[in-house]
Design a protein with these regions (language model features):
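Conserved, well-structured interaction surfaces
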Residues: 19-43, 61-141, 157, 161-164, ...
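Short, well-structured active-site flanking segments
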Residues: 138-149, 209-216
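An aromatic- and glycine-enriched ligand-binding surface/loop that stacks and positions planar moieties
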Residues: 2-65, 175, 193-287
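Structural transition elements
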Residues: 153-165, 208-211
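Solvent-exposed loop/turn segments at secondary-structure junctions
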Residues: 144, 152-153, 268-270
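Glycine- and aromatic-rich loop/turn segments at beta-sheet edges
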Residues: 145-150, 179-188, 227-233
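Short linear capping/connector segments at secondary-structure termini
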Residues: 8-12, 79, 148-155
Length: 287
């Protein structure tokens, strides 16, 4: 046994993911990578919109971005390029988030917990992050590889699983999460309403409409959320705009009076790590 390495002075999964704080840090990595979809120059959600009927390229200060769509999705193309397209990031960033979530899920029983409620809250958030990625992937690609545990050694034999099977698996996970994820969360983190909102979309994808009504109603009737019907925020006294304008102003997104906010992707000009100070470029790049 003396040849067996024991990481006493370095960080390793065995001596790091030992409590709620440590496992939640892995889920913070999921939150970080989730914001990559939206922020910065040519983020992938703009690529997705341009490759659909939602938008056309609006960039006028450089060439190359989304100019030859059929050519830019060929197998030998670079689909993670600010000057062309970042459509491929849905795959690479998605499976990174799945990896982080699976690390938490696989190690959930190895940590020390204060209560079952604390444990299941963290587990429920991990289920949410994994389900959120798979919901996007199956609607973009159809059948995709389904990875449900932490991978700790080289693996090459990945096979696709049917879209419906994946949707049914993530529905089951989200139903568990909806029972345990807490109602309140720090701005930018996952709360119960976010779980039920995603569960509603999964139910709709499965054409299980009564279940969709139930999960949507859980958000609408939680006493916290609801449709905004009155002007609010920084421009509420400006007669030239309306409530739709109010909802889409960055100054108003995180206001407590905004009852339509469920889960916020947080950016801050004072945070420079990992592009956290970057803003949305959709008004520049998508028309």
């Amino acid at each position: 046994d003396f040849l067996k390495p024991e990481p006493l002075s370095i960080y390793a999964p065995e001596n790091t993911f030992v409590n709620a704080e440590a496992l939640n840090s892995a889920l913070i990595a999921c939150l970080r990578n989730a914001r990559h979809e939206m922020y910065g120059d040519t983020p992938q959600y703009i690529s997705e919109g341009i490759f659909s009927d939602i938008a056309v390229e609006g960039t006028t200060d450089k060439t190359g971005v989304h100019m030859d769509l059929p050519a830019q999705i060929l197998p030998n193309e670079d689909m993670d390029n600010t000057d062309r397209t970042k459509l491929g990031r849905y795959w690479t960033e998605g499976y990174k988030r799945i990896k982080y979530a699976n690390t938490v899920i696989s190690r959930i029983d190895l940590a020390t917990w204060e209560s079952d409620a604390q444990k299941n809250h963290i587990l429920g958030k991990a289920y949410f992050h994994r389900a959120n990625v798979y919901y996007r992937l199956v609607h973009q690609h159809g059948d995709v590889p389904l990875i449900l545990q932490e991978i700790t050694e080289p693996k090459l034999d990945f096979y696709s699983v049917t879209r419906e099977s994946i949707l049914r698996k993530i529905k089951k996970d989200l139903e568990f999460a909806a029972q345990w994820v807490e109602v309140d969360a720090p701005i930018g983190d996952i709360n119960k309403a976010a779980v039920n909102h995603l569960l509603t979309k999964v139910n709709l994808s499965l054409a299980e409409f009564d279940d969709a009504i139930a999960s949507a109603s859980a958000v609408i009737n939680d006493g916290i959320h609801g449709l905004m019907t009155q002007r609010f925020g920084a421009y509420k006294d400006d007669p030239n705009h309306d409530i739709i304008w109010d909802l889409h102003q960055e100054e108003n997104k995180a206001l407590p009076e905004n009852r339509e906010r469920i889960w916020l992707y947080v950016g801050n000009e004072q945070l420079t790590e990992d592009g956290a100070s970057e803003k949305l470029s959709v008004m520049r790049q998508a028309v």
